[in-house]
Design a protein with these regions (language model features):
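Short, Lys/Arg-rich flexible segments
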Residues: 1-73, 98-150
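Mid-chain, well-packed structural core segment of small domains
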Residues: 67-92
Length: 150
């Protein structure tokens, strides 16, 4: 019985950082495809942008955390050039209330862009999360099968 418990702990809690990164990367790739599809469906204009890619084409996946440290996490986001645009779409904007000199603007505080909350809605969507979990389970199964062969 103890051998079974030790084997289960070795597979689950004692995973190496590389194995955790493989599992989370599989889920992050699926989520990135969903983000790209959602932005293409709702915010894409079919026009020639030249060398400047559209926001939907700027979704990136990195196999590290937000700070760039490899600890088994994977991050989905946008390139540096487009992240601020995604923030405007996600959260919306308001006009400033006061000028730099402290005077109040005529229409201060009015909403200029309504937030779309695309990424938040995708995170809360059970269909998308089930796809992410399935991809992670497939990667996890490959790691377990590889360990069992050794």
């Amino acid at each position: 019985m103890n051998a079974f418990v030790e084997e289960a702990e070795a597979v689950s809690t004692a995973m190496s950082v590389e194995d955790k990164a493989k599992v989370t990367k599989a889920g992050a790739d699926v989520f990135a495809k969903e983000v790209e599809a959602e932005y293409k469906a709702n915010h894409y204009r079919h026009r020639v942008t030249g060398e400047d890619p559209h926001l939907a084409d700027s979704v990136i996946v990195q196999n590290s955390n937000v700070d760039g440290m490899k600890n088994g996490n994977s991050t989905v986001g946008f390139s540096k050039d487009k992240a601020y645009i995604a923030n405007f779409i996600e959260n919306g904007t308001k006009r400033p209330m006061y000028t730099s000199k402290g005077r109040k603007y005529k229409r201060g505080g009015q909403v200029a862009i309504n937030g779309d909350h695309t990424i938040e809605n995708l995170r809360n969507n059970p269909e998308v999360m089930s796809k992410v979990v399935e991809a992670q389970a497939e990667a996890y199964k490959k790691i377990i099968d590889k360990r069992n062969k050794q």
